[in-house]
Amino acid sequence: MGCSNCQPEIKTSLHSKDSNDFEDDVWGDDDVYVDANADVKRAHQKQGYLDGLASAQESSLQSGFDKAFSDGARMGAAVGKILGELRALGESESFYQATKELNIAKIMDKKYFDSELKIQKNHEVIYKWQKIVAQHLEDATKA
C-alpha cells in the first residue's frame, strides 16, 4: 500500500525568499516551513489522548460497576425472596402482581436513585412487597 522509494522531505518551504510575489507581504513573514512529520506527530498525540481518555473511562466505569453491583445484588436477592415466599405460600394472585411491580426495569427506575445515582436505602416497592409477604405469613400462621 505504501509507495516504494518515497521519502518525505523533513522541511519544505512554502515559498522561497527569492520569490518577488511575497516581498510586498504586509506581515513580512519569513519563510514558512511545514514539518512533514507534523501529521504523524498529530496522529500520535491524538491517539495517545484517546487512549488515555478510554483508560480513564474504563477505570471509572469499573469503579461505578463495583459500587453498584452489591446494591443490585441485594435488591435482586430481596425480590427473589419476596417472589419465592409468595409462591411457597400459594399466593398466586399476589405473586402475579409482584412479578409485574418488581420487574427489573421498574425497580431500577431513575426515581429510586439520588443525585449521585445511589439507590435509596428503603426501596418503596420492595418495602411494600416485604410488608405484604409478612402479612401473608402472619395470616398463614394463624390459619
UniProtKB/Swiss-Prot annotation:
Pfam families assigned to the protein according to its UniProt record, in alphabetical order: Yae1_N (PF09811)
Domain of life: Eukaryota
Signal peptide: none
Main location: cytoplasm
GO molecular function terms listed in the Swiss-Prot or TrEMBL record: protein-macromolecule adaptor activity
Keywords, in A-Z order: Cytoplasm, Nucleus
Segments of this protein annotated with the region deca-GX3 motif: 48-88
InterPro entries, A to Z: Essential_protein_Yae1_N, Yae1-like
Keyword Nucleus: yes
Subcellular location, record wording: Cytoplasm; Nucleus
Disulfide bonds: none
GO cellular component: cytosolic [4Fe-4S] assembly targeting complex; nucleus; Yae1-Lto1 complex
Region described as Disordered: spans on this chain: 1-20
Gene Ontology terms describing biological process: protein maturation
Function: The complex LTO1:YAE1 may function as a target specific adapter that probably recruits apo-RPLI1 to the cytosolic iron-sulfur protein assembly (CIA) complex machinery. May be required for biogenesis of the large ribosomal subunit and initiation of translation.
Family indicated by similarity: Belongs to the YAE1 family.
Assembly mode: May form a complex with LTO1.
Annotated protein name in UniProt: Protein YAE1
